[in-house]
Amino acid sequence: MKKIFSALLTVCMLLGCLSACSSKKSPSNGGSATTGAKDTIVFAQASDITSLDFHVGKNPATYDVTCNIFDTLVTWDADINVIPHLAESWEFLDEDSLQMHLRKGVLFHDGQELTAEDVKYTYDRAMNSTIVKNNFSWLESVDVVDEYTVVINTKGAYTPVLNALCNPLAGIMPKHLLEQNDEAMTTNPVGTGPYKFVERKEGEYVKLEANENYWGGTVATKYLEMRVVPEASQRSTLLETGEIDIAYDVPPSDVERLNTNEATAVLSAPSFKVFYVTINCNSGTKALNDSRVRQAIEYAIDKDALCSSVMYGYATPAASLVGLGVFGYDDSATANIYNIEKAKELLSAAGYPDGFEMSVWVQSADQTRQEACVVLQDMLSEVGITVSVEPMDGTVMDDTIVKGGDFDACSSMYYNLMGDADYVLYSNISPESTSNLSHYNNPDVMAKLLAARSLTDDAERAAVYKEISSIMAVDRPYIPLWAYQNLVGVRSGVSGFQLNPITAYRYENVANGK
């Protein structure tokens, strides 16, 4: 633990210097003229959106904003049960056909009425999108029955279809605008949601205004602003000074301080987010091509100590990519438990008794992930593995990897937007998925995953996911580290804000009474 503390102290000092420099260069992050008004709520997050069109860019920062502009056919209640939304009712015509009946009189922000044609156009477009087609791998086609009725046809029976339709990436877009200009949503997104787009300044903010014709009723606050504040500590400071009202991803080290301040509080609840290390199974570092080496890396990691030292206990050690609370989560010990001698034994068997050198790419804007990687660097040194931690811009990192650039390993976080194991497993193990950054390819695992999609018995489907997790604990293309607690800081005057494990927050019922 002394080594862990020393490693953390080093990275925190470095990050503190970077933060101070960043603050001097970016005073505009300090506030806006509207921050103090009761008719405005300002929330801050670490990253900017990649696009206002989530078929073009889908990072978490994107759907944190777009989920307030666009509506889905169905959604979740506070207990993650599927409830009506744009679709007021539905029924299964057979195992692979779901008929849905739309609400009448729902208007897009430009006054045009939502119809079944918009649903079909949106999903056809999604299936042809390089960015989100993986999220619709289960979808065969959409049929328009009449103006307010559609049939969702799946590729065979797809048990979690309703959960898939709750995904913020399944929001409905306007056919009449996209037919005229396929890039219309990138500059002026128009949905049916509680907020309308006003303005975006890239790298700084997105401003929204309440939809006065929202089908769901009166929106609680007139203006909503998303502020980009990369430094986690700066988000906490802005919350304390009242320059923002809500801060996403509060650093665990700030929780106690914010909770003792009468003007602020930190909301905490389990999430479906899992933090893990992606190992490139085709890396130019040949050692990483051997599953025994990848297992050894996990055996060398003390996940309990990692959660304690980096997350201050606001995380749970993870055994698989399927997070706590997600359907298919296996709470049995399928992970490779911390065992230094076992790690050394596996390295020796693989031909690396003295270890080897590797690099880990980590998002430069994420203080917590950088701290974690420095601790991992220290832990892996105990078995002779020399790790170079290389911070870089997250977007550059993702683009480099997706385009086939060589790398050894990178820090990764997966947001399960469906609450189902199928979502995270398909994205990360399918050879066709752009999210399969490890280049993992196991036909047996893929066959099991596809077969599980049609199982209607929950116990049978969960058993398949458990089997898949066990196989992946041996192959280990991904090394799961922890499942996150949601940590969101709020000002005392804010009411109506509710955490959810999906972490895409809606604001129609959030008021600012400060």
Task: Give the positions of each predicted feature.
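N-terminal lobe/hinge region of extracytoplasmic solute-binding protein
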Residues: 44-94, 124, 190, 489
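Gly/Pro-rich hinge or "lid" segments in bacterial periplasmic/extracellular proteins
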Residues: 77-81, 167-219, 223, 345
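Surface-exposed binding/hinge segments that line
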Residues: 91, 95, 134-177
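Alpha-helical secondary-structure segments
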Residues: 116-122, 147-151, 193-194, 221-223, ...
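Ligand-site clamp/hinge motif
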Residues: 212-257
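Structural transition elements
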Residues: 316-349, 366-369
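Extracytoplasmic/peripheral linker and loop segments enriched in polar/acidic and small residues
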Residues: 388-397, 423-491, 514
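Long beta-strand-rich cores associated with HINT superfamily self-processing modules
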Residues: 488-514
